[in-house]
Amino acid sequence: FNALHGDEGENGKLQAAFDLLNICYTGSGAQGCMLAMNKSLSKQLFRTHGIPTPEAVILSESDKCRAAELCEKLGLPCVVKPASLGSSVGVSIVRTNDEFFTALDSAFSLEHTVIVEKYIKGREFAVGIVGSRVLPAIEIIPKHGFYDYKNKYQPGCTVEICPADIDSDTAERMAKATRKVFRVLGLGAYARADFMVDENGIYCLEANTPVSYTHLRAHETKANLV
């Protein structure tokens, strides 16, 4: 049972090693894990297949000197994040030019490819899928700031509401998008898609596998935790 998180646990390397050694494991295969972990690739696939996702610019280190020019169309505020890290490590919401360049330096210190994404001001949701069954959406409400590393893992920093208080149309659109993400990325068994929702619609931020099953998600799947 693969419950590992972080680079080797999520980016497909461990799954590829298991495949070579003919070791059975749970969750998605090597290719699906790689695509889900690499947000620059997954965002390109989202666009190609009509999955709504925030507008973004992918930067390499050679682009740093003209990053402001390349990202001008996104405006401020915007989101700066490493392309292939999880748990919101290295993610910044920037509101000024000075913050933009500081956030770029921080993200590039962690990885060679960085995503600059249009900031969506709205509500945040996580939607799990097990097999063909989409689970009820969970609304993520940090008490302070955004859903960063601290708010994800420090008890009491975030409120999670399940099922989320949303209209049936929004719930169905997120469920439909989650199924499509699952199929397009070639994920298996279980996964999670993260969304922002504003007055203009839904936006898929990324897919996650293996997922972080909170007690709420476990309750919805009727899992027994020991």
Kindly give the residue locations of the regions a language model identified.
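Short beta-strands and strand-loop turn motifs
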Residues: N2, Y25-G29, P82-G86, C204-E206
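Conserved N-proximal alpha/beta basic substrate-recognition cap immediately N-terminal to
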Residues: N2-V57
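Active-site nucleotide/adenylate-binding loops and adjacent lid/helix of ATP-dependent enzymes
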Residues: L35-R123, A175
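Phosphate-binding site of ATP-dependent enzymes
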Residues: R95-K176, V197-Y203
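Conserved metal-phosphate-binding beta-hairpin within the catalytic cores
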Residues: K118, V127, F182-Y213
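Conserved small/polar residues in nucleotide/adenosyl-binding loops
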Residues: T214-A223
